[in-house]
Regions:
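Cationic, low-complexity basic patches in intrinsically disordered or flexible, solvent-exposed regions
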Residues: 3
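The feature marks the mature, well-folded catalytic cores of soluble enzymes
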Residues: 7-315
Length: 315
């Protein structure tokens, strides 16, 4: 029995996430295999997917698989342990960031849209390797998705929507109850929430998650889109936190193409979309190595690199 317990201890994944940029050691990368047929407009979860469904240019599975494999190769190049979901036939499993997130050594399951609940079951082989006492299910009324949650040292930054019309927005994914639940779960942290701009119809005016309009990068730098925030003072708080000279402001179109949704392997290494010329040039000016990948097809679903990764361990 002692040997069994010892083996269990060394086999468990020891979670550790305290920020967005420390050296990545283990991650769950989504999959585009067996992604299913083109959804109907009624089945679209966001305005950008709906836009490409209407235009008849919704991304093809083979193109998305190729894009994700390019990311997998870069992660392997940097010796990152990569887990993948078990493939469910005809089911979208690209955006693993939505289904769960890690803060410190806690694995927190998201309360997501009911149609997407199978996605968490598809990573059960990963969850089984986590100490069960570290797995948290938030109360049912606390709606949350990982794209809205960013640990940053003593802070946990959370995107939300505080409007009384929350239920009218399919694009509102994290509510005030979830913000409160996180503060209870991490009383030693400062949980700071940001009221995000939502639109069911115009993707250029929709911050689906916090990482669609903001992300820390490098050493004390950040990418931000002003109009993603409904409250000017909350946007200013973030700019002041990093310092104006350390913030890269992206335009409405750059937000639409998901420029703030790159992914950090380390403080000095990021994976970014190859068409983000202005951003990638700025990142290199900061001394950051930019590993460029094609990801424009996946971005048609209003998600990019951060959205399709679920980090488990950073140094």
């Amino acid at each position: 029995m002692k040997l069994f317990l010892y083996l269990m201890k060394i086999l468990l994944v020891k979670l550790n996430i305290n920020n967005e940029t420390s050296r990545l050691k283990a991650v769950v990368l989504g999959t585009a295999e067996s992604n299913g047929p083109v959804p109907s407009l009624e089945e679209a979860y966001d305005p950008k997917s709906a836009e490409f469904i209407r235009m008849g240019s919704y991304p093809k599975e083979e193109d998305m698989v190729e894009e994700m494999e390019a990311v997998a190769k870069i992660l392997e190049k940097y010796k990152v342990q990569v887990f993948r979901p078990k493939v469910i036939k005809d089911y979208n499993q690209i955006f693993t960031r939505d289904i769960a997130f890690v803060i410190e050594d806690k694995f927190i399951k998201s309360n997501i849209l009911p149609d997407r609940e199978q996605e968490i079951e598809a990573i059960s082989h990963v969850i089984k390797q986590i100490d069960p006492s570290k797995i948290i299910q938030l109360p049912e009324e606390a709606h949350i998705e990982g794209g809205d949650v960013m640990p940053l040292g003593d802070y946990i930054l959370v995107g939300t929507y505080r409007g009384a019309d929350y239920k009218d927005y399919i694009t509102a994914r994290t509510n005030v109850q979830a913000v409160e639940a996180l503060q209870e779960l991490f009383p030693h942290k400062k949980v700071v929430s940001f009221n995000l701009r939502k639109s069911n119809t115009e993707p250029r005016d929709n911050a689906l998650h916090l990482d669609c309009c903001f992300q820390p990068v490098g050493k004390g730098k950040a990418i931000i889109h002003r109009n993603g925030f409904l409250e000017e003072e909350e946007y200013n708080w973030l700019v002041n936190l990093f310092g104006k000279e350390n913030v890269f402001e992206i335009s409405r179109d750059e937000m639409y193409y998901m420029n703030s949704n790159i992914f950090s392997i380390d403080e000095d290494v990021v994976i970014s979309e190859k068409n983000f010329t202005r951003l990638n040039a700025w990142l290199r000016e900061q001394g950051i190595t930019v590993e460029e990948v094609p990801y424009a097809e996946i971005s048609k679903q209003e998600g990019l690199l951060r959205c399709s990764t679920l980090p488990l361990i950073r140094e």
